[in-house]
Design a protein with these regions (language model features):
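Short amphipathic alpha-helical segments
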Residues: 31, 43-44
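Intrinsically disordered, low-complexity segments enriched in small/polar residues
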Residues: 3-30, 86-135
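Short acidic/proline- and small/hydrophobic-mixed sequence motifs that coincide with surface turns
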Residues: 37-41, 95
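Short, surface-exposed loop/turn motifs at beta-strand boundaries within globular domains
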Residues: 22-24, 37, 78
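Extracytoplasmic/periplasmic/luminal assembly and interaction segments
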Residues: 45-94
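Structured catalytic/translocation cores of nucleotide/phosphate-coupled proteins
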Residues: 10, 14, 44-49
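Asparagine-centered strand-capping/turn motif at beta-strand->loop junctions
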Residues: 29-38
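Serine/threonine-rich low-complexity intrinsically disordered regions
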Residues: 1, 59, 69-71, 119, ...
C-alpha cells in the first residue's frame, strides 16, 4: 500500500507545481449587462492589435466571456498598451473606457466589466474590476 501512496503523492505534487508555475498569457474578460436594454456595437482594442475584438450584442441581464491573447492578437510592433472598451454613443461620438490601464508581453489576468445603465445619449455607465500579473 505504501508503494502506491508515495508515488501517487509525488506525482500529484509535481503536477500541482507544474500547474502553479505554468506560463500564463492574456486576459479573461467578463462583460455583464446589468442595464435594462440590449447593448451592441462594443469592441475591445489596444495599440498594435492585429484586429479589434468585436463584441456581439449582449442581451439585458446576460454576461459574456472573452479571452484576449496578447501573443496571438498583437502585431510584431507590440511593446506595451492599455486594453480599452470602445463604442459610439447615440450622437456618433466615440466613447472609450479603459479596462486594463497597462500591460505588455508576459502579463496576464482578468477583468470584469459591469454595464450598469445607459443614459439618454447612449453613454454607458460602467464599473470595471481588473487584476493583472506579470509572468
Amino acid at each position: 500500500m505504501k508503494r502506491i501512496i508515495v508515488p501517487t503523492v509525488f506525482i500529484l505534487g509535481v503536477i500541482g507545481i507544474f500547474v502553479l508555475f505554468l506560463p500564463r498569457e492574456g486576459f479573461d474578460i467578463e462583460i455583464e449587462n446589468q442595464a435594462n436594454r440590449d447593448i451592441s456595437g462594443l469592441y475591445l482594442t489596444y495599440e498594435n492589435i492585429k484586429k479589434d475584438i468585436e463584441i456581439p450584442t449582449i442581451m439585458a441581464g446576460e454576461k459574456e466571456e472573452y479571452q484576449v491573447s496578447v501573443k496571438d492578437n498583437s502585431s510584431d510592433n507590440f511593446e506595451e498598451a492599455a486594453l480599452k472598451l470602445v463604442y459610439e454613443d447615440n450622437e456618433g461620438n466615440q466613447q472609450t473606457e479603459y479596462i486594463i490601464g497597462y500591460f505588455e508581453k508576459g502579463y496576464y489576468g482578468e477583468a470584469k466589466i459591469n454595464i450598469l445603465s445607459v443614459d439618454e445619449k447612449g453613454k454607458l455607465e460602467i464599473e470595471v474590476t481588473e487584476n493583472t500579473k506579470l509572468f
